[in-house]
């Protein structure tokens, strides 16, 4: 094979090239494996720039638009969902240089189709056009074939070794793979064998062969990493995890080297035919990214849609609250995750009795734990992915009987794994079906007819693995209760409800669990906190610190199944005969609230004509939409529950209890802005990205998914790893069920206090300054009084004035 480097005046230095490679690695988001998948902001690398600039950058890098088609906005204008005042306000807020001169010009632009987004070409794409061979497809297929084995987490019986790193492992495979040469890339195996043994040296060598200028590096490297889809993002996940522990990981750089070797080989194979087109492409990569007038128009229309939704939300919050305030002691208090799915259940539960109070807090309940399940050595990080575990916990007591049960469970698990490998092994799999098929008839019927009833996790109660001294336990309890704004007025029964989802035949099941628990269900954290707050020594210490929990108050953990709205109480953790009547009443209320919530959800779910259909759907192998998860999420509200109680927020708002009057120094407010708000933004923007650009930022069609390596899904039998949400998670087959809107964050706190915190956290501030999130300060009556205008400035919110229209029933 010969290589034909393009003309280049000055070759960038090694350090300059590697620095550009590292920047490109941070321009793509990480992808968590299926076992603990969490929502990730697909625009994580573009948070420092506004929507129009990110749109211009991703158009070049991925060939996608990151707003809806103009027709989507035109329909909303015509129907009145977007009012002229929304359009005018968004226009005035846009960059003056490129925005339409006036409202009529903007309305005219809405009717015109925007130019189709076009990515800058790679060498593989130029070679495809020249040779009529699908080189991009071949590159993706061969890299995907290797990567599925390299990143495998136990699915493959014969795993690819990982010694030496991704680049070295790929070279071993590629030097024996004749597929590229059969397709027409002569001498590719020899070319790879002769390439530098070190990934960084290979990158530098390829840059020289490709004739890349320094200015072209960032854009071109970013472009190549986007062509890798989820494989590049999985490598970015490894870097993310390494950096959390103060280390680093070269996997992204290794994959970039692999992709560059393909590019250099294809350019050399194409000879002079590809050089003119490639030189034009290099020049285009070297041009600075600049937003066009179309990018600005699209960003204006997107903001207008968001202002329309904010106007309706403002009317809901300004209307008189229908909630009744009970006199005397509260009968039941129940703390839920802030997840939007909890809003429906909380509203249903509170409607049953004025003596019921619910609270909202991040579902990990302030306990950053690494947890080992019963009979397992795998440590599960049950906390937001932005954090690292501070405490290790395990299931079961440290007793001889527990140890015997642990050993028995481990032996059974190993036998099950051995049987599973026997079923799939190269030789035994052929005889397996004929020999043992009849044994599985009953199971096939039970599963195929959705007769099996899944149960909530019921492991032994969790405990700290190494024990915690009293001062540590007391500090944790104090911090958590203050963060929950829950320091008084305790009921006799306080339920701490984590949440999870019981579904079948769903590779993305963990994405339905609690994002604040790292993609796991939340019962472990809830059970740990209940034990902590029932500790008599902790209660005595809390009383000395001014938090008095009555002696008759019992804390219990629960698990809210968001698919069926069933609630499991972990009463065995803390038996209390004196609370038998309280528990009986609570069970009755929870059953009734579940029925109300299922009835509300059934209206939105396809083929769920009755609330009774919900449970059957959760057990149905063929059900591709067991629940809508967080589709429709629109707002994050941190305020006292009295501001939202009784108001129909339609399961579209994250609800976090917060009272700034009891937050000395605004430490709790700082925690909310830097943790739950950021996690909610990741969720919101993943839904946004999977809706506006499903072909690139979404996971594709569930019906075509195949799990690969136990880490992710591909469509069909190979290729790139898909990321984001499946199309069925945002679309019901006829229309979108998720309205792509950037999250509106509403906080009841003094605007100057919020601004002070933003000033201390530049990365969080950038999300608001560049309007990836909208920010409002609520006044003392819960109205959206102040809008954040960027650069630590606030303005009066026109729609936050006292509303005269009290007829708005819900967010729509």
Swiss-Prot record:
GO cellular component: plasma membrane
MF GO annotations: zinc ion binding
Keyword entries, A-Z: Cell inner membrane, Cell membrane, Membrane, Metal-binding, Transport, Zinc
Record's bilayer topology term: Peripheral membrane protein
InterPro entries reported in the protein's UniProt record: DabA
Source species, domain of life: Bacteria
Binding site for Zn(2+): 337, 339, 499, 514
Main location: membrane
Localization: Cell inner membrane
Cofactor: Zn(2+)
Pfam families reported for this sequence: DabA
Protein task: Part of an energy-coupled inorganic carbon pump.
SUBUNIT field: Forms a complex with DabB.
HAMAP family, per database record: DabA (MF_01871)
Similarity remark: Belongs to the inorganic carbon transporter (TC 9.A.2) DabA family.
Name of the protein in its database record: Probable inorganic carbon transporter subunit DabA
Organism: Xanthomonas euvesicatoria pv. vesicatoria (strain 85-10)
Gene name for this UniProt entry: dabA
